[in-house]
Design a protein with these regions (language model features):
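Catalytic Walker B motif of ABC-type/P-loop ATPase nucleotide-binding domains
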Residues: 19-23, 282-286
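Conserved ABC ATPase signature
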Residues: 1, 231-233, 257-261, 265
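Conserved beta-strand-loop-alpha-helix hinge in the C-terminal portion
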Residues: 73-104, 325-326, 334-337
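Conserved structural motif at the start of ABC-family nucleotide-binding domains
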Residues: 121, 135-138, 254
Length: 337
């Protein structure tokens, strides 16, 4: 919330005539989205401020918007009123993943380097503090093999911190009672022994991934959990990278430099990276972040299909309930301390 509110406040203090915002509602919980909707709506009523919103999710269009210009395949359509746009907006197909691709995912062979424990994650009375602020307090949480969890909560409630513990990225985990894949943290395992079982994507990873490599190399970096590609994959591994890029509909982007892609295309590349090693545990933090409605449907289909396979476990964070796949079996809601 703070990273969103501060630039907005600074901008409004300069008394602008035009306010341009690129996907301002992404990453905000429902309460904060409503507050921002209300704030912008009131500003348009009491000032001469002209608001221009760039939105990848048309469901986020606020009621105070008067006109819409749709953009498709890098081409601007004609200007129309909001009511006209809503009347002609194309319905999203109930399914975007083809039956052929669905069968390919379901028939993927299982690797030989699997863990063999009933519990994937065990947290016992875990507390995390940063300075004077307590982020998590006495949290007990068990994720069993094959479960699919929805992790939710207000902004600042500790969701990202919790995921960093599961991903072995938080140094405070060594002082906590945490067991991952049957191995207690601090018992001699390396973070790479943990990460090899995990496929992960998040907005933070997206913002930090500034490597201007070919898209297929970004996907391949997921094989060894590196930021960048420092070990040339074997031919069969590169074939797996191309396979997953095809599943996500981005095979044509494999030789394009990552930083030259649109934000939505980059997100699809990072999703392919999360799936490329066929992980036992998927950790998806706002996986549909920044995608248009068609690709949101496609990614949701891929997630649901992947999770139908035996012993696949998932933890997914989203601020939009409608984004949760039908395979969700459990939920955890975090409250701000």
């Amino acid at each position: 919330v703070q990273t969103c509110a501060l630039p907005i406040s600074k901008t409004l203090l300069s008394n602008p005539r035009v306010l341009i915002m690129d996907n301002p509602f992404i990453g905000l919980d429902a309460k904060t989205r409503d507050l921002l909707h209300t704030l912008l709506g009131e500003l348009t009523k009491v000032t001469h401020l002209q608001v221009i919103l760039i939105l990848s999710k048309s469901d986020d269009i606020p009621a105070f918007i008067t006109h819409v210009i749709p953009v498709e395949d890098r081409v601007c359509g004609k200007k129309m009123t909001l009511q006209e746009y809503l009347a002609v907006r194309k319905p999203i197909p109930e399914r975007m993943l083809s039956e052929e691709k669905e069968a390919r995912i379901l028939n993927l062979p299982y690797g030989g380097d699997l863990y063999h424990t009933e519990h994937v994650v065990d947290l016992n009375k875990v507390s995390i503090r940063y300075g004077e602020r307590t982020i998590l307090k006495d949290l007990d949480w068990t994720v069993k093999c094959g479960e699919k969890w929805a992790l939710s909560g207000e902004n600042g409630s500790g969701k990202s911190t919790l995921l960093s513990l599961v991903c072995a990225d938080n140094p405070q985990s060594y002082a906590c009672d945490i067991t991952l894949f049957g191995r207690k943290r601090g018992s001699g395992e390396s973070i790479w022994e943990i990460k090899k079982h995990i496929g992960y994507v998040s907005p933070e990873m997206h913002r930090a991934y500034l490597k201007n490599l070919p898209a297929i190399d970004i996907v391949a970096s997921g094989l060894h959990d590196s930021v960048g590609l420092y070990k040339r994959p074997r031919p069969e591994q590169m074939a797996a990278c191309e396979w997953w890029m095809d599943i996500f509909g981005i095979a044509n982007l494999k030789d394009r430099n990552f930083l030259q892609l649109s934000s939505g295309e980059q997100r699809l590349v990072l999703l392919a990276r999360a799936f490329v090693k066929d992980p036992e545990l998927l950790i998806l933090d706002e996986p549909l972040h920044g995608l248009d409605l068609y690709n949101r449907r496609l990614v949701k289909d891929v997630i649901e299909t992947f999770c139908r396979r035996k012993d696949k476990t998932m933890i997914m964070v989203t601020h939009y309930q409608e984004e949760l796949p039908a395979c969700i079996t459990n939920s955890l809601f975090l409250k701000r301390n």
